[in-house]
Swiss-Prot record:
Pfam families xrefs: LpxB
Lineage, top ranks: Bacteria, Pseudomonadati, Pseudomonadota, Alphaproteobacteria, Rickettsiales
UniProt record similarity statement: Belongs to the LpxB family.
Protein name: Lipid-A-disaccharide synthase
Database matches in InterPro entries: Glyco_trans_19, RPE3
Length: 446
């Protein structure tokens, strides 16, 4: 029996891990005439740390909830430092006791790197793969050397990342970004009916993140921004997307006295598609919102000490990946001291009421998404598609294609072939280069 030990520390990593597990179970990357292809499902066992996606993918039970390690920031992490150290010790011990044949860590470098470093000293021959290259192009380029000393292989999500690691001797493969595996919704009218959105309502999507600290840090300014918008847009409906249903209880106390209509939903991709505009916390969600064809602004702040430390370390002008790749501000950013209600509300209103501005942002964002691996057919967009009038009354109900969305079929389309998606590519490499030789040895022993 071959054991693969996975470690994912947050929802995005859990999604990637779950998809890779599914492809590994489906004999990804093993030739059909291979003597090991029919042996794979019985020969490989998944263990480690993960979430619901990894648990749904197979007989996998997490060593502990990933919410325990879903932390970030220099100062924010301090109150949890002793708890994290215990979890690192527990994970290292579990890896050794499991007699794992392969360790796969996914993102969450604050936790996964420390675990891998300890394990490398104790098990120098254990094969290790890390998925999601650290952003050495943004800050601390020296981390590439550190990763090269520990890992056997690194999977990068961005096409320009491998050279940073190959030049220091680490085998780094570009597999593409996981958002290419998402299915984005295109029928805005049907979604408005599903969420019982009146034909006259304008929809603002709000994302606050997956960490409790992030949510609490942004709630006051986000709610104040929305209240400002409501003064001039009293037909506003706000939908808060929830990374975890339990987060509703955190948000509700901040909404006790508000006048605007709101609801909560965990179906984030549907909400991104149905929204007229989004107020987003910086992160992977911004790529998903852009892929859904929705204009947005990004706002983010951290603890003040963390901010100044980051300012000393970081060497890029933007925090949003689309802006970083474009090297210009396509998506408006309101970071730290600029994360203020008046600035945020003014820009959101501009996107709500200026269809030309909203259209231009979506088109420019789409060009960057294509660089990340999305395929693009002829665009079905025109500036009039952003007029809210098109979604009113009978005209909206009769119109089939007139939507201000970049549809999966017509604009931002991932390949319909499984072997073009990142998790398939990752699973193929894992199986062909790391598992197949082991499985052949097991077959020979039998």
């Amino acid at each position: 029996m071959i054991k693969i030990y996975f470690i994912a520390g947050e929802v995005s990593g859990d999604f990637v891990g779950g998809r890779i597990m599914q492809h590994l179970k489906n004999n990804t990357g093993v030739q059909l005439n291979s003597p090991v292809s029919s042996f794979v499902n019985d020969a490989v066992q998944f263990v480690g740390v993960g979430g619901k996606y990894m648990e749904e993918a197979g007989s996998f039970k997490s060593l502990f909830p990933i919410t325990s390690i879903n932390l970030m920031g220099f100062v924010e992490i301090l109150p949890h430092i002793f708890k994290l150290k215990k979890l690192i010790d527990k994970t290292v011990e579990d890896i050794i006791n499991s007699k794992a044949d392969l360790l796969i860590t996914i993102d969450s470098p604050g936790f996964t790197y420390r675990v891998a470093k300890r394990v490398r000293k104790l098990l120098p021959k254990l094969k290790m793969i890390h998925i999601v290259a650290p952003s050495v192009w943004a800050y601390k380029e020296g981390r590439a050397v550190k990763y090269a000393k520990i890992y056997d292989c690194l999977f990068a999500l961005l096409p320009f990342e491998p050279p940073y690691f190959t030049k220091v001797g680490l085998d780094c493969r570009y597999i593409g970004h996981p958002i290419m595996e998402q299915e984005f919704y295109s029928d805005k009218i049907a979604l408005r009916e599903e969420f019982k959105i009146d034909e006259n309502e304008r929809v603002l999507c709000v994302t606050l993140g997956s960490r409790k600290g992030e949510i609490l840090r942004h709630l006051s300014v986000f709610v104040s921004s929305i209240e400002e918008i409501f003064k001039s847009c009293n037909n506003l409906k706000v939908i808060f997307t929830l990374a975890n249903p339990a987060h509703e209880a955190i948000i509700k106390p901040f909404l006790e006295d508000v006048k605007f209509n709101y609801l909560f939903s965990s179906e984030r991709l549907k909400i991104y598609a149905v929204a007229d505009v989004a107020l987003a916390k910086s992160g992977t969600n911004t790529l998903e919102i852009a892929a859904s064809g929705t204009p947005m602004i990004v706002a983010y702040k951290v603890n003040l000490i963390s901010f100044f430390i980051i300012r000393l370390l970081i060497k890029i002008k933007y925090v949003t990946l689309i802006n970083i790749i474009a090297d210009k501000e396509i998506i408006p950013e309101f970071i730290q001291f600029n994360c203020r209600a008046n600035l945020i509300s003014n820009k959101l209103q501009e996107l709500l009421f200026n269809s030309k501005k909203a259209y231009e942002q979506v088109i420019e964002s789409q060009k960057i998404l294509q660089q990340l691996g999305f395929k693009s057919n002829r665009l079905q967009l025109n500036s009039e598609s952003f007029r809210h009038d098109e979604f009113k009354g009978k005209l909206a109900r009769c119109t089939k294609v007139r939507e201000h969305r970049l549809s999966l079929e017509n604009s931002l389309v991932s390949s319909d072939r499984d072997d073009a998606v990142p998790s398939y590519i990752a699973a193929a490499i894992i199986k062909q280069e790391f598992l197949e030789p082991k499985i052949k040895l097991l077959k020979e022993k039998d």
